[in-house]
Amino acid sequence: MKRTIVQIIFFIYCIANVYPQYSTIWQLGKTDNSSKEFALAPDGKDRFIISGFGDNKKYFYAGEHTPADFPYIIPGPTAEWAGSSYWAGQCRIQLPILIKLSDVNPLKKYQWNIFIENVEYEDCMFLRVEVNGKNYDSPIKPDTKQLIYSIQPGILKEGYNKIVMQLFNGKSLTFDAICLNGPQETQINKIGDTPIISMKMADYELEQGKTRTQPLLLKTITKKSGTLKIQINQKKIFKQVEEGENIYEIPTGKLKDQSKIKVKISTEGQTVATQEFIRSNQQLRRSIDYVDQFAGSSGSRWMIGPGPWMPFGMVKLMPDNEDAHWKAGYEYNVENIMGFSHIHEWTMTGLLMIPTTGDLKIQPGTEKQPDYGYRSRINKKTETARIGYYSVDLTDYNIQAELTATTRSSLQRYTATNTS
């Protein structure tokens, strides 16, 4: 009898761990197979762009905004009504959501659920949900009605959480409802007017007059323009902040080797953040270090990409990842690479190189099916481009590729990242 009771208790324990009990922390919309409560529904998708949706800096504030502030549909990279076409290329559409949570359990899983009214399907279609920088991908079929994303322990955090949705390889997906499920103790809180998303010391120094300083990087996502009062030790700074997502460099005074500073940030008479930091000597940042080499590389053409080109150089080295068509070159949305071409001119390319391992393949494969050829998936998190330098990890081959170029030649270094 005792053995039976122990077995029953053990069985219940296993069930509770395999099928954890979730409660709804936040929900947007009703699960009624209808999108009528969302913005632009039922057929206003042509106003998606002019309504400001799709901008990765236009945030939806969970717990404050309503379904009427969130679009009923998310377009994929080939949706013409959202800016894509044969001539214009792909569009990069993202729907960012900001959620402020309290009593987050770092040892428990959470769930992001998406209920779907309709799918306008294309091959290899999937929806990505990025949670605080961690990507979760879920494939979509023509009859998919629900997507469940299991968020691992420790990904969601106390305070502000950034969740971004992006549709890949498809026309569109129409929402029925969206919800976050998790432990019962976790609660959603109001965002506030000036959320301080993060504070950290920069990994560089700036010139400040005749001295150098290591700036504090302050990231905010604000509803409206305003003023922050920043106190660093005894010094007070008043900083004007703009609407939307921005990163500000806050000077921290003359740097003397390693030193500790205490930072307190206030707005409208209320303290919103306090933290201590250790300053240390870093390299001086130059003006060219602010250049974003990826700017304009989505929905663009062959002449715009993250390659390390010399001005008026004969060699124009750049990663190529698009299938053959009139504007093919580099597209930021594509997460694999066909190789690195040395020529990018009007209707002309050439001398493509890519390091590989394993069996010999003579076809490149396609954007959607890289395994059909010698293409390699890449790690977008570590892809780096700055003036005169490009680096990417070819994850299918465990090779890091580094590129630079002179006026008439390229220099490439391939490093095996997994010697086994």
Regions found by a protein language model. Name each.
Residues 171-172, 268-274:
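Short, exposed coil/turn segments at beta-strand boundaries within extracellular/luminal domains
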Residues 91-96, 107-113, 203-218:
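Contiguous beta-strand segments within globular domains
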Residues 1-21:
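Bacterial Sec-dependent N-terminal signal peptides
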Residues 207-215, 221-225, 254-266, 275-420:
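Accessory carbohydrate-recognition regions in carbohydrate-active enzymes
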Residues 22-107, 115-187, 241-253:
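Beta-strand-rich ligand-recognition modules
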Residues 181-211:
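Short, compositionally biased P/S/T/A/G/V-rich stretches that sit at domain boundaries
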Residues 108-110, 123-127, 224-228, 261:
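Short beta-strand/loop motifs in extracellular/secreted proteins, especially
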